[in-house]
Structures are given as C-alpha cells and as structure tokens.
C-alpha cells in the first residue's frame, strides 16, 4: 500500500511517502520549487513520487481545516481559500501530527511529548503523556496565547520575515544584552496581557533590531522555562516550530531529550501518516549518486579551506547534516567572515561544528544530545581560542554530533591528518535560497559562489 503524508497551504510544504508502512521518502517543497519556505507542493515533486513509487491509495493532511476556519473567524481573519490537491485528502489534527512524528521517531516507549508552535487549529502549546503508543492530552494553550506567534511578531518588528527568518532573530539576540529595561517591561506586558500577536506588534519607536531580538529571546526563554519546569518525566520529546529555537533548548538538560530533524510543520508530513515506531533518519530526500568523497573533501579543505558536498540523499528539514553541506576549516581565524561572504549572510550569524560524539565533552560543556543541530552548548575556553569560527557571540555553539558513516570516517580522517577534531558545517545555499537539492542546483551554486562542490 502506498500512502502519502502532506503539509501545504500555509508555509513549509512537504511530502512524505510510505510503501507498506515503510517511510521511503520525505522532502520539503522548497527544495523542488526553489522558493524559500514554499507552502505549495510543486508538480515536479508530486511527479517524482508518482514515477518512483506509484500513485497513493490514501493521502493524509497535517491539520483540520474546519477547526482552523473556526479559529480564523474568531480572530477576525478571512476564511481559508479552498485547498486543491491532485488526490482526495484525509484531514488530521495539527498538534497530533507534530506529536506523532516526534514520538514515533524517538527512542522512548513512555515519555512526555511537548509541542510548541505559532498555532495549529486552536492549540499553540500541548503536552501529551504517551505510554506504549497511547497518547493522552494533559496540558494545552489555545489561541491567542502563543509563544510562537509572539516570536514571529517580534521577528517582523525587528525587520525580518515572520514564519521564515525567526532564526535570524535568534542569532541576533546574542549581539547585545544592554537593552532598556523599560522596553523589556513594555513588551513583557503585552505577553502578560495575552495580546493577540497574529497581526504583528507595535513597539512604539523601538527600532534597534538587536535590542528587539535580545528582549524577544529573553522573554521566550523565561516562558519556556516555566513550561518545562512543570513537566514531571525523565523522557521528553520536543516538537513544533519552537523546537528550532536551539538557544532555548539548552534548558532541557534535566530530561532525556529527543528533538527530531524536522520538528516544524514540514515534519508533520511524516507525523500525520505515521502510526508506528520507525528509526530516525534525516537522509530521506533526493539522491545524488556516488561514493561519499572523503579523500577529495579533505584535499580541498587543506588546499582551499572550504568545499561544498552534495552526495547521497538530501536531508529532510532545515539543517544540512553532511550531504548538502558547505564545509570549512574552523581553525582558520577569519573563516566565519569568509563563509558569510560566500553565503551573503549577516556578519553576526553563527556557524555549527560537526564533531564526533565522543569528542563533544572535550570541547563543549554539558548539554543535551544534538545529532541534528538541535541545541547549543557553551564552548570551552580552549575551543573559543582554537576554533573561533564555530563559536557564537555568546560563547555557544550549535553542535552536530556524529556517530555514523560516512561523516564519521570524514571526521576521523580529517582529525588524523590535521589534528582538528571538527569541521565548520553550514548549509549548501546562499541567503534567501533553499538548500541545494539536485545536480542542477549544484552547478548553479558553483557558478554563483566560485566554490567547488564534490
């Protein structure tokens, strides 16, 4: 039996394909349309799935549009436009789709699943107690109370795109902590008064984007800690768009924590169609054939200090985890500026280290497991001195812990030849464009950046 899971219509469209209950493919719409955060699943992605696995017998959709329209009416918003898809769709619940994706890809049998996002149909935060696959809703917030909507409104107020550039706001929050306490109190009062943030926020003359970012992150972290402090469980699964706030995720150390590779709405394309445990695997997208070029990568890094890699199946989600990556030598002092120039990014934006799991505690302080760049750790003094290009302004690093080949072999050989235990790893794209997907995208990236891609 062939079944599809889908997300589309709002933002972060995605398609997942199951054959006889085995997940065989998942990809974000933007990789195929080349439109950042594309809400529509493009025809070329649908045709690719049809040609490779056949026509689906059932198609699941990640939310309930009737409930969503009820909430939009309550909020004074216009009804949703009618959604059109090639096949009939079966509607699911937004937060349940998140929760199922998180739980069924996690290592836990019993746990608490925490979902925080901008908004589903009505829910903006839910907690689920799960025992051997049996989900019980134990806590919830409904619209208009929403940490995700608050953070998106602050993103817009700072001059960036809501529902797309929240990660820039998060990075910018480390630039300064010297904000005006009265500005903080004014914004906090909006949160405390349960303001509806879906129409944006008026900050009455506050225009410094770094001050706005710092206040937004501080308020988010304060409210996030209130939520997690009440959770009584050893095992925690965290999903929803807010699970991408890697800075705040550093507070999850009291739990055995699992955050999947695509915790936002894209991952719900898997969750809405999933009803059993599967092994977590981020490499589910389009495949560029060929052996992973470990020797060539190291040679290029030693000669030019930077190289792109596009081999194997593309990652599902917003993180490049070695198969669609731009690698650089983190021991070069000005490497951060060089990579930011190639990618056209803001100078304050951080870069991640890819490092063997067994080396993490040598170079970074305590934190939760991070195979998918899903949290930050404080870098040790030694790391900050030796590898400054992977340390953010606040002294943290967003880590990718590596355990499996071929990336394990790459790091082992790199360490053996250079003594450096890590690589700077960032996504293979330039600012404003989706991550490279196929061979055609590779050529375009090489032409635009003059960086070799293997």
State what each model feature region is.
Residues 214-236, 414:
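Phosphate/ATP-binding catalytic cores across multiple sugar-kinase/actin-like superfamilies
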Residues 44-58, 227-234:
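Phosphate/pyrophosphate-binding loops at sites that engage ATP/ADP/AMP, CoA/4′-phosphopantetheine
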Residues 54-66, 233-241, 308:
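Short glycine-rich phosphate-binding loop at a beta-alpha junction
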Residues 208-212, 216, 220, 240, ...:
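Secondary-structure capping and boundary motifs in well-ordered enzyme cores
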Residues 30-40, 214, 218:
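Active-site pocket-shaping loop/turn-to-helix segments
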Residues 7-36, 51, 66-68, 72-192, ...:
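Flexible beta->alpha loop and helix N-cap segments adjacent to enzyme active/binding sites
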Residues 1-4:
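Extreme N-terminal starter segment of soluble prokaryotic enzymes
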Residues 171, 177-218:
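Active-site cores of enzymes that catalyze phosphoryl transfer or operate on phosphate-rich substrates
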